[in-house]
Amino acid sequence: MILVIGHAMAKPETLHAMLAISVEHVLRSRTEPGCISHEVSADVQQPLRLSFVERWSDLAALKAHFRVEASRAFAKALAGMADGMPQNSVYQSEEIDLAAGRG
């Protein structure tokens, strides 16, 4: 599984617009092949910080997501409104079943 963790800092005057385009992006992305989950949330300690967490079935699905014109337009629009550059980190991961070791 591929895990994407990112964040973007809003300015007070851009927070509402950044949230709106982020929710639209999340809802669209969830319909793409290979998307397991895609979420955006506001940090409770830093309300201007938007956090993104995405889970993709494989790297090919994530690369296809990055090639979607709407994804590219979202990234450009978000960067244009953000206070600084949005950050993204991509990881290859596997889920660990913590209950499997009990017994």
Feature locations, PLM:
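N-proximal accessory regions
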Residues: M1-I2, A17-L19, W56-D58
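Hydrophobic packing within well-folded, soluble alpha/beta domains
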Residues: G6, M18, H38, L50-F52, ...
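Active-site-flanking beta-strand signature of metal-NTP-handling nucleotidyl enzymes
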Residues: I2-A8
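Glycine-rich beta-strand-turn "strand-cap" elements at beta-sheet edges
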Residues: V40-Q46, K76-G103
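An amphipathic, aromatic/His-enriched active-site/gating alpha helix that lines ligand/cofactor pockets
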Residues: R28-I36, R55-S89
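Short, surface-exposed ligand-recognition loops at beta-strand->loop->(often short) alpha-helix junctions
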Residues: A10-H16
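Short, glycine- and small/hydrophobic-rich beta-strand elements in well-ordered beta-sheets
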Residues: V26-S51
